């Protein structure tokens, strides 16, 4: 009985990155041909996972002429003095900017992925959702395909005009009336 309690306490959870992919031409069978959808794939914790057009280099090939040979990569990491793992994303395309939510990443720029974010480049949209874990051995990636656009207005910052005089409607005033 005591051994069972010890095993339960020391069992590690695996970080899982769920990626929901969308492209306007999603019905084109070859576009996502190299990706196994709706199946979790276990990956060694020290692996760098590449996305791009090059089928020989990229674990997740995106077969479109508008995608760079290697578009971006994802890597698992842990912050100093933290037990849970998370992911970072690095733009490896010299010709395409990569957007994480509304943050623009140029070539070789990298950032930590938020727990839920939108990754965009070209016509591709990828909703990334992280379930953090503490395993030092492996992580999982699960890809899903969306048939509808993932970009919502909530990802686009909107600025509301602020009226100077407290009225919400524009009022014309003749210069001579002041």
Swiss-Prot record:
| Keyword annotations | Cytoplasm, Immunity, Innate immunity
| Outcome when changing residue 172 to A | Loss of interaction with traf6
- Domain of life (superkingdom): Eukaryota
* GO BP terms in the entry: activation of NF-kappaB-inducing kinase activity; cytoplasmic pattern recognition receptor signaling pathway; innate immune response; positive regulation of canonical NF-kappaB signal transduction; protein homooligomerization
Q: Which locations, inside or outside the cell, does it occupy?
A: Cytoplasm
Domain FHA per the UniProt entry, residue ranges: 49-105
Coarse class of the primary localization is cytoplasm
- Expression (tissue specificity): Highly expressed in spleen and moderately expressed in ovary.
Q: Which GO terms describe its molecular function?
A: zf-TRAF domain binding
Q: Which GO terms describe its cellular component?
A: cytoplasm
The record, for InterPro entries, names: FHA_dom (IPR000253), SMAD_FHA_dom_sf (IPR008984), TIFA (IPR033621)
Instruction: Summarize subunit and interaction data from the UniProt record for this chain.
Output: Interacts with traf6.
Question: What family is it from?
Answer: Belongs to the TIFA family.
The free-text function statement in the UniProt record for this protein reads: Adapter molecule that plays a key role in the activation of pro-inflammatory NF-kappa-B signaling following detection of bacterial pathogen-associated molecular pattern metabolites (PAMPs). Promotes activation of an innate immune response by inducing the oligomerization and polyubiquitination of TRAF6, which leads to the activation of TAK1 and IKK through a proteasome-independent mechanism.
Q: What is this protein called?
A: TRAF-interacting protein with FHA domain-containing protein A
> Which source organism does the UniProt entry give?
Xenopus laevis
The uppermost taxa in this organism's lineage are: Eukaryota, Metazoa, Chordata, Craniata, Vertebrata
Q: Which gene encodes it?
A: tifa
């Amino acid at each position: 009985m005591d051994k069972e309690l010890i095993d339960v306490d020391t069992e590690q959870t695996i970080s899982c990155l769920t990626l929901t992919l969308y492209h306007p031409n999603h019905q084109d069978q070859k576009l996502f041909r190299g990706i196994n959808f709706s199946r979790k794939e276990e990956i060694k914790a020290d692996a760098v996972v590449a996305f791009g057009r090059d089928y020989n280099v990229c674990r997740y090939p995106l077969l479109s002429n508008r995608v760079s040979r290697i578009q971006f990569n994802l890597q698992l990491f842990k912050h100093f003095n933290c037990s849970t793992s998370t992911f970072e994303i690095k733009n490896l395309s010299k010709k395409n900017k990569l957007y994480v939510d509304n943050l623009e990443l140029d070539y070789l720029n990298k950032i930590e992925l938020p727990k839920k974010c939108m990754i965009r480049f070209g016509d591709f949209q990828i909703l990334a959702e992280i379930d953090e874990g503490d395993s030092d051995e492996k992580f999982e990636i699960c890809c899903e395909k969306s048939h509808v656009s993932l970009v919502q207005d909530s990802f686009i910052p909107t600025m509301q005009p602020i009226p100077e005089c407290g009225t919400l409607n524009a009022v014309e005033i003749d210069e001579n009336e002041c």
